[in-house]
Amino acid sequence: GVPSYKEMGWQSGFFVNSDMAEEYGIDLSTVKTLEDYTEVLKTVKEKSTAAGESVIGVSGMSFNLTTPYESLTGTPTLPGASPVSAYGNFAGEAEVFNQYASQDYMDYCSLVRDWYNNGYLSADPVNYDSDTANRDNDFANGKLFSYVISYAPGAAEAEEAKTGHGVTFVPLLDPLFETRNAMGGLLAISSASEYPEKALEFINLLNTDEYVGTLIRHGIEGEHHTAVGDTQIDRTMGGTLDPADNGYDYTYGWQFGTPFNQKWDISYPENIEEM
């Protein structure tokens, strides 16, 4: 297969209901680590309870998403890791180690248990976190304050459009590039293809021709989007169309070729390629 040339690194953190954070007087700029987030969750618990509500502080806690290390198996939840020296964690561990036998993992478990005991998590986090539809519904309706996410540029803007309230991303670590990220998406030609040469020619066109790339990702100009300058499109067509109802664009265009050879939606930051 031909790898999809997209954002290669990953960066984890929290998607936060920024409207609620502002209402509760929470300064998210103070959050740099998981430990810092304890005070945020405490405030959410106290103020939502005082208002007669029961807002869940955070969902989706995951050691492999909140702790940087190089996964040696390609599946970060499986044992087998290597420390990344730039982050300064996993002190004293060998070049290859079991991340679940580390002090870092013990500290993580202790912290999350404290959060659970203090009522910052769902009463049944295992089942709650596995039901993403329920999570998304609660986040949209103000019953969930935040959840852990592996961030991609533009994701917060897409979440805002979906929920109808402000959404901000609070990073927990600097972006990390792993070998597995480069293999995260690819276009392959079926062994049953009658015309594999033509299929490969199309994949090449998808990766090199801006018109074709934009067409496949965003649809037909004037019907599914409008052009904004030379490098952007507007999926709302000047605010006259709900992107969810435009009949084409479903926000996963990064799967097709390279987003860096396509026009970007205006919801993305202007410096998206630099990011």
PLM features: what roles do these ranges have?
Residues 1-275:
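Extracytoplasmic/secretory soluble proteins
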